[in-house]
């Protein structure tokens, strides 16, 4: 007998006892059953849930501390094992960031005055790459190597775009920067189709109309392919719907595709990703590791 059957039998037994004591008629018994069922299946679980939540909130500090203590010890062991490599990585990130800062300070006035789209795009990519590399460092030091690889994918994507812009110059860089309008409009349209199910407020029709108008003007200027993903590179690639793999080839970085694919296993919900475990044990890890 399962829990529901046991609960139903207990309710019926109690209803029969109360009905006999109070000499209830058929209508009274029905009302009593309704009250008992509501109390058991609606009020009861709510009271239990409220109590469980209250106890859980009281236990959170202790629970988190129990998790934090071994994690801190683990990170210290990981640092001791991989300190040389981690220090080299961090020093590379620091030097790269400092070089970017010097370049930005030297050319800032030139960028603002001449509205040089190429320099602006490359500087923005450099900033994003420094932030991403810093995230890789944090993940490595915490033992999340697969997640660090996932962020390395972003570094590869940034490198591909940077190489492509450098090769083709300011006209392509301008298209790249203006493509933010296309992505904003696409996001707004997706929100418009989903806000009700999300339980959010509807978008402002005026804002959406404004975004679409900006998109349409850019498509008139650069062609209808501009509205597609990577549409800013459509003319350079020679395809209406270029893919990132097309961009890799055009940037002469497609030889790194195997690394990019391997890093993707930690990102996407594929079968391969479920089996690729960066560890020396066959145990399925739900915690960080030193490899």
List PLM regions with ranges.
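Short, solvent-exposed helix-helix connector turns and helix-capping sites enriched
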Residues: 82, 144, 168-169
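Extended, well-ordered alpha-helical segments in internal regulatory regions
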Residues: 161-169, 269-273
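Secondary-shell segments that build the walls of catalytic and ion/ligand-binding clefts
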Residues: 1-110, 180-291
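Long, hydrophobic/aromatic-enriched structural stretches that serve as scaffold segments
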Residues: 95-164
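Short, glycine/acidic-rich hinge or "gate" loops at secondary-structure transitions
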Residues: 148-149, 166-177
């Amino acid at each position: 007998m399962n829990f529901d059957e046991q609960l139903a039998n207990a309710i019926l037994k109690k209803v029969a006892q109360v009905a006999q004591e109070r000499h209830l008629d058929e209508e009274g018994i029905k009302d009593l059953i309704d009250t008992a069922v509501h109390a058991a299946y609606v009020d009861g679980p709510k009271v239990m849930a409220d109590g469980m939540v209250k106890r859980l909130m009281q236990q959170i500090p202790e629970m988190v501390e129990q998790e934090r203590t071994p994690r801190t010890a683990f990170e210290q062991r990981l640092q001791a094992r991989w300190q040389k490599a981690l220090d080299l990585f961090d020093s590379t990130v620091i030097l790269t960031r400092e070089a970017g800062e010097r370049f930005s300070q030297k050319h800032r006035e030139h960028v603002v005055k001449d509205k040089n789209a190429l320099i602006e795009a490359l500087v923005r990519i450099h900033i994003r790459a420094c932030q991403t590399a810093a995230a890789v460092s944090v993940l490595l030091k915490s033992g999340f190597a697969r997640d660090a690889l996932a962020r390395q994918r972003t570094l590869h994507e940034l490198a591909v775009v940077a190489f492509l812009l450098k090769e083709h110059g300011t006209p392509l860089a301008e298209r790249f920067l203006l493509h933010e309008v296309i992505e904003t409009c696409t996001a707004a349209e997706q929100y418009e189709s989903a806000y009700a199910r999300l339980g959010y407020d509807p978008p402002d029709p005026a804002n959406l109309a404004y975004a679409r108008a900006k998109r349409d003007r850019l498509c008139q200027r650069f062609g209808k392919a501009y509205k597609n993903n990577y549409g800013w590179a459509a003319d350079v690639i020679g395809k209406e719907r270029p893919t990132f793999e097309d961009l890799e080839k055009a940037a002469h970085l497609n030889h790194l595709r195997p690394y990019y694919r391997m890093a993707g296993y930690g990102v996407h919900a594929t079968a391969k990703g479920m089996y690729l475990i960066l560890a020396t044990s066959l145990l399925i890890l739900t915690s960080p590791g030193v490899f």
